[in-house]
UniProtKB/Swiss-Prot annotation:
The gene is Spata18. Pfam families: MIEAP. GO terms for biological process: mitochondrial protein catabolic process; mitophagy by internal vacuole formation; positive regulation of cardiolipin metabolic process. The modification Phosphoserine is found at S13, S85, S123, S127, S154, S157, S283, S285, S508. In testis, expressed primarily in spermatids. This is Mitochondria-eating protein. Induction: By p53/TP53 and p63/TP63. Directly activated by p53/TP53. Its main location: cytoplasm. It is found in: Cytoplasm, Cytosol; Mitochondrion outer membrane; Mitochondrion matrix. Residues 239-251 have a biased composition (Low complexity). It comes from Mus musculus.
Length: 537
């Protein structure tokens, strides 16, 4: 219906009809009778077309209303209208016929030539008025049939829609039942999984206290064993120190043999000691554990600076009692410092290996956690370092060093305190992250202003290092503290002497024999293997 109505609105038939009526009114007096009749017939034809379209729209509208709707409206309004129009048409026909009879009689005398045309138009109008009611009745019958068919079709479609709705409701109920069943099964599975997880967590929680208790028992047993071993070692060391004579009263050979036997016995005792085979866990010192790496580094740098400014000068004073040459004294102290760092680094490596062996059975974490535990243990147990053994190793290395030429009466045991302090500093520096170490130095190398400062008696224009007074302290490749070196132009080549395999056996006439550190019996030394002149210095 909407499409037919849109077509009627777009065709503008009613507006064209109104325009024609207006045009006919304006030209009615100037037109002839035939022209006016033609205008009237055209208007009737146009009205008939519009009426036919309206009847089609009426039929479609009635079909949309169904079998019951619109019937009363058609009966009440359309049928009476059609009846009145038919009766008015008939009455108008008689009146018009009478009027036409009188008018025809009057006009026949005037327009005898136009009478046949007028009769023909009149007969056409009469025939059209007679056929129009029959056409309207036929249209009504057709519209009734179409309305009945539309009603039957609508009832059928309504029944089909109701059946489809019922089927959809049944499907919806089945889907809801399936969804409820799935939800129940998923909830049951989740509850079972939660129960199993709760049971597993309970089991693990029950097992963890047992493991913790066993670990604590092992730890306690290890502590007891370590305390017993350390107390035994302490008593042995105290008895040994009480029985050992002063290092300056015996002969050099006796001291050397004693140091060798002592070192062998200590190495043997260390190898057989339970502390070396399986090191025990000690409770960390609270003060040392609280110290951060930065604080320990600052403290070690301060100790190293104090060793340069105070301990080095004290050692020089001790050596100057027996040696007049300042160059030899400074060389001895530099070599002692370098050897102390070397021996302390080796001792730190062995100590770290023992700690790893000790902590390996109780390690349950990753490698990083294990290394962290090893480092923390070493930091908290730096007092376990055997510095006296390192001092003996340093003195042995100095005795066979070919670069030191000095009177044989001077014993390097004079530098025991200095060497022990340097060994402790170097050992503690290896526990830092990153560790600190001294720079490599060799006689005759090019002077590096970033590593060393020149001594007061140096030639400040000389490019080569004559000898080193104090090593530079390094952190990776960065200089932390500068060392000290002596530079002299041309003095290095003039001072080169043949390398001596052993120290001289002749007595020194420089100092009296009653001075500290001078032996009454000459001491011979066995030849030592030739070392590289530039090794570690």
């Amino acid at each position: 219906m909407a499409e037919s109505l849109k077509k009627l609105a777009k065709s503008e038939s009613l507006q064209a009809l109104q325009d024609k009526v207006t045009y006919w009114v304006n030209d009615y007096n100037s037109n002839s009778c035939d022209q006016n009749l033609n205008y009237c017939i055209e208007l009737i034809e146009q009205v008939a077309k519009v009426q036919a379209q309206l009847f089609g729209i009426l039929t479609v509208t009635a079909q949309e209303g169904g079998n019951n709707e619109g019937v009363e409206t058609i009966k009440c309004r359309l049928l009476p209208l059609l009846q009145t129009s038919f009766s008015s048409v008939n009455m108008g026909k008689t009146a018009e016929s009478e009027m036409c009879a009188t008018q025809d009689f009057q006009l026949r005398s005037k327009n005898r030539d136009n009478s046949p045309d007028q009769d023909q138009h009149q007969s056409d109008n009469e025939s059209f008025s007679e056929t129009q009611p029959t056409q309207v009745q036929d249209d009504l019958a057709e519209s009734g049939k179409s309305l009945e068919g539309a009603k039957n079709g609508s009832t059928i479609s309504l029944l089909a829609a109701e059946e489809e709705i019922n089927q959809l409701k049944k499907q919806l109920k089945s889907l809801q039942a399936q969804e409820d069943a799935r939800h129940k099964t998923s909830e049951n599975r989740r509850s079972e999984a939660l129960k199993s997880d709760h049971r597993s967590t309970k089991r693990t929680q029950d097992q963890r206290p047992q493991d913790v208790v066993s670990n604590y028992e092992k730890h306690l047993q290890n502590l007891k064993e370590e305390i017993a071993v350390l107390s035994a070692e302490k008593s042995g060391l105290q008895g040994r120190s009480a029985r050992s004579p002063s290092p300056s009263t015996g002969t050099r050979s006796h001291r050397r043999g004693r140091s060798r036997s002592h070192s062998r016995s200590r190495s043997h005792s260390r190898s057989n000691s339970p502390c070396t085979t399986v090191a025990k866990i000690r409770s960390p010192s609270p003060n040392r554990a609280k110290m951060s790496s930065v604080a320990r580094k600052a403290a070690l740098l301060s100790r190293f600076s104090d060793a340069y400014s105070q301990a080095r000068l004290d050692a020089q004073c001790l050596l100057r009692r027996c040696i007049d040459r300042a160059e030899t004294v400074q060389r001895i102290i530099y070599i002692a410092t370098v050897e102390a760092f070397h021996v302390a680094k080796m001792a730190f490596r062995h100590f770290k290996i023992r700690v790893r062996k000790m902590l390996t059975p109780s390690n349950v974490g990753s490698n990083t956690d294990f290394e962290t535990a090893v480092s923390e243990y070493i930091v908290c147990h730096l007092d376990l370092y055997d510095s006296q053994s390192s001092v003996n190793d340093v003195i042995r290395a100095m005795n066979v060093n070919p670069k030191i030429s000095f009177p044989p009466e001077v014993d390097f045991c004079l530098l025991t305190d200095f060497i022990q302090e340097i060994c402790c500093i170097a050992f503690a520096m290896q526990s830092l992250e990153p560790p600190l170490d001294i720079a490599f130095g060799a006689d005759g190398e090019i002077f590096n202003d970033c590593k060393y400062r020149r001594s007061y008696d140096s030639d400040f224009t000389a490019p080569l290092v004559f000898y080193h007074v104090w090593p530079a302290l390094m952190e990776n490749d960065c200089v932390i503290m500068k060392g000290e070196a002596v530079t002299k132009r041309g003095a290095f080549w003039s001072s080169v002497r043949p390398v001596m395999r052993c120290r001289s056996r002749s007595l020194s006439p420089i100092c009296p024999r009653n001075h500290f550190g001078i032996s009454t019996v000459s001491r011979s030394r066995s030849p030592s293997p030739i070392r590289c002149t530039f090794a570690r210095y």
